[in-house]
């Protein structure tokens, strides 16, 4: 008995070594096969796992935010006649509405109020909770009539109509919307702010304050035959003055045309309607496609001094063209100026351009003010003219002989030629203004001297006709002297009329804007490039996430190309590709939910759970293989006894394997010690 006990008893020193080895094995095995179900925040934090496993790659489905992307970035025509052709009426198709979390700033939005011929409404009222799109640079408000062959207005390409964080497949009456799709956008890991309260009001457009960061400009239209094959669209300048729109144009063109008509007093002052038509030579694409800050940045301007206004006819009764009674038809023609911008230096006084515009001796301002004629014009230098100004333009008259005398005549001695002056002053009476004294700040001026190769600008002639004078009379001159007028107007043309905060970008082939601008319910600190995105989830009301969006040049173009491809794949709702992507995200969320008790997918799979989006220009992500788990201590919610039984014993499988391994190791060590001893 004693000998057997001595055989089982280990030497003291050897027992210490063996015990130390056993404990090392146990601790090592414990660290390797730790029961993942009892991992707490005291071991590893989620941020540490992100840094160790995923680094800067996509780490969780919580980083995917649904964002409304506008279709205008794809280069589609945004003018009202072109946009309405993309919308059509259908019957028997129920509308569908989906929500999104953040929206992109829109350059063009639309607001429709269309009636049928019997006076009934074409479009339905918006449901409760549907509000207008809150970030629009231009709102095109269209009123009119149409056949409306159907119950609801859908998008022919299958796109959505984006409202305030709601995307619908139909158009609602009197509610501002923009065209777009809903896509998933990857955001950086945000910061949670628990102290921020839910905003009491949603963001709204600011249309009155010109200094507002979100200034919105509303353009009004009248449309007939809406929803038909051939529709007629009129741009509304005021209640009695309209412009016929017959080709694609930019909203900036309409803004400048409106300013030109008002500045030149080309508005109807009677109860009749004055409708202007545009000459084919007028280029309506004067604006630059770009996002906006306070006001629009322009790459080029509509020069009102090159526009000629001519009254064509007056209708007193309804005719074959369905013109209403008292309608005055006018035409806006375009006379391009000679390209002479290099003669107007930007770093010197504007008078220099006058002194270098084909004169052989210095021009005296005092002589012009006193009504004296100017000599010293030469024949050859007149091929180059003064840079265009809002008052005078210069052209070469081919009918004039090549040799001209050096003396010049004033306006009363050389009236404008009929070939260059198209305005009939006897027909301008229907649009004459009653108060013309405010048209020009000068009250007493002198006529401008001209040479025979130079023609008078129609604006100057029109202004003289408004004051009751003609080009052949000099009793009451209406314009200042040549030098005074040109210097002041050139100075005005050189000074920018619009505040530009960003450098002007040239139009690109696909018209992609590299800047991302997003709006959400939280608007404070609305800096360019920042996205304030509300977080909506279980027990998360009042919590807002601040995500930082960097303005990456290739990102927005890629997203818009994706939006365009997605749009073609939609049929009034998301088609198979988008549905499969949604199902994949739901599956990954379900996996994350099931595995969160054991540390999450990244904890189990390691780096194999991480992926990085491969091609931003084709799609946002090809697949999602990585989910980050936020370590929690709370057990899974009760969903039944079977689920509790499963989660109750399944989570101890790794721990049981570890314990069995330790027992086997101890028995093996005892056996080895027994054999050796």
Curated annotation (Swiss-Prot):
InterPro entries: Ebola-like_HR1-HR2 (IPR054584), GPC_FiloV (IPR014625), GPC_filovir-type_extra_dom (IPR002561). Disulfide bonds join 54-610, 109-136, 122-148, 512-557, 602-609. A lipid is attached at residues 671, 673 (S-palmitoyl cysteine). GO terms for biological process: clathrin-dependent endocytosis of virus by host cell; entry receptor-mediated virion attachment to host cell; fusion of virus membrane with host endosome membrane; symbiont-mediated suppression of host innate immune response; symbiont-mediated-mediated suppression of host tetherin activity. Residues 55-202 are annotated as: Receptor-binding. Residues 673-677 are cytoplasmic. One of its GO terms (cellular component) is viral envelope. Residues 34-651 are extracellular. Residues 315-326, 370-421, 429-472 have a biased composition (Polar residues). Glycans are attached at residues 41, 205, 239, 258, 269, 297, 317-318, 339, 406, 420, 435, 463, 564, 619. Residues 306-486 are annotated as: Mucin-like region. The record marks 502-503, 638-639 as: Cleavage. The signal peptide region modulates GP's high mannose glycosylation, thereby determining the efficiency of the interactions with DC-SIGN(R). N-glycosylated. Gene3D superfamilies: 1.10.287.210. This is Envelope glycoprotein. The gene is GP.
């Amino acid at each position: 008995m004693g000998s057997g006990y001595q055989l089982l008893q280990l030497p003291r020193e050897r027992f210490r070594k063996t015990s130390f080895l056993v404990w090392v094995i146990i601790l090592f095995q414990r660290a390797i096969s730790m029961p993942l179900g009892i991992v707490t925040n005291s071991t590893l934090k989620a941020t540490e796992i992100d840094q160790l496993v995923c680094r800067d790659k996509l780490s969780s489905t919580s980083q995917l935010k649904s964002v409304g992307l506008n279709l205008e970035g794809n280069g589609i025509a945004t003018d009202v006649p072109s946009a309405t052709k993309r919308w059509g009426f259908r019957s028997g198709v129920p509308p569908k509405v989906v929500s999104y979390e953040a929206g992109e700033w829109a350059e063009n939005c639309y607001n429709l109020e269309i009636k049928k011929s019997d006076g009934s409404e074409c479009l339905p009222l918006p449901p409760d909770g549907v509000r207008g799109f809150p970030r629009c640079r231009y709102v095109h408000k269209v009123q009119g009539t149409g056949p409306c062959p159907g119950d609801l207005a859908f998008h022919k390409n299958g796109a959505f109509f984006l409202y305030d964080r709601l995307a619908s497949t139909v158009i609602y009456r009197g509610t501002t919307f923009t065209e777009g799709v809903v896509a998933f956008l990857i955001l950086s890991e945000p910061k949670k702010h628990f102290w921020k309260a839910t905003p009491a009001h949603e963001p709204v457009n600011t249309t009155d304050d010109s200094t507002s960061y979100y200034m919105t400009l509303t353009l009004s239209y009248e449309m007939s035959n809406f929803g038909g094959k051939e529709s007629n669209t009129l741009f509304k300048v005021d209640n009695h003055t309209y412009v016929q729109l017959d080709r694609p144009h930019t909203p900036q063109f309409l803004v400048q045309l409106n300013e030109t008509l008002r500045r030149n007093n080309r508005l109807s002052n009677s109860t009749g309607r004055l409708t202007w038509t545009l000459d084919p030579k007028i280029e309506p694409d004067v604006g630059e496609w770009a996002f906006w800050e306070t006001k629009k940045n322009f790459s080029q301007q509509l020069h009102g001094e090159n526009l000629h206004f001519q009254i064509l006819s007056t209708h007193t009764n309804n005719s074959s063209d369905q013109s209403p009674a008292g309608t005055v038809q006018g035409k806006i023609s375009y006379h391009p100026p000679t390209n002479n911008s290099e003669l107007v230096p930007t770093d010197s006084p504007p008078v220099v351009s006058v002194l270098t515009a084909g004169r052989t001796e210095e021009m005296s301002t005092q002589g012009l003010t006193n009504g004296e004629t100017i000599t010293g014009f030469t024949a050859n230098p007149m091929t180059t003219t003064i840079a265009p100004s809002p008052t005078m333009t210069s052209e070469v008259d081919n009918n004039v002989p090549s040799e001209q005398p050096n003396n010049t005549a004033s306006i009363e001695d050389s009236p404008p030629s009929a070939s260059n002056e198209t305005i009939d002053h006897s027909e301008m009476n229907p649009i004459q203004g009653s108060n013309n004294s405010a048209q020009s700040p000068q009250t007493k001026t002198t006529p401008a001297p001209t040479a025979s190769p130079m023609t008078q600008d129609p604006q100057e002639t029109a202004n003289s006709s408004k004051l009751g004078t003609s080009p052949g009379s000099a009793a009451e001159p209406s314009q200042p002297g040549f030098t005074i007028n040109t210097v002041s107007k050139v100075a005005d043309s050189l000074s920018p009329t619009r505040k530009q905060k960003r450098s002007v970008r040239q139009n690109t082939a696909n018209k992609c804007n590299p800047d991302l601008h997003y709006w959400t319910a939280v608007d404070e600190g609305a800096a360019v490039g920042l996205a304030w995105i509300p977080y909506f989830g279980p027990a998360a009301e009042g919590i807002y996430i601040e995500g930082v969006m960097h303005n990456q040049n290739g990102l927005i173009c890629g997203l818009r190309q994706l939006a365009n491809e997605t749009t073609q794949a939609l049929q009034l709702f998301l088609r198979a590709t988008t549905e499969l992507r949604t199902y994949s995200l739901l599956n990954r969320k379900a996996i994350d939910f099931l595995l969160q008790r054991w540390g999450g997918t990244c904890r189990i799979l390691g780096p194999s759970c991480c992926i990085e989006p491969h091609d931003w220009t084709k799609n946002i992500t090809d697949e999602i293989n990585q989910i980050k788990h936020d370590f929690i201590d709370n057990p899974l919610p009760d969903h039944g006894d079977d689920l509790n039984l499963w989660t109750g014993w399944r989570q101890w499988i790794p721990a049981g394997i570890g314990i069995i391994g330790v027992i086997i190791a101890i028995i093996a060590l005892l056996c080895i010690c027994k054999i050796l001893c």
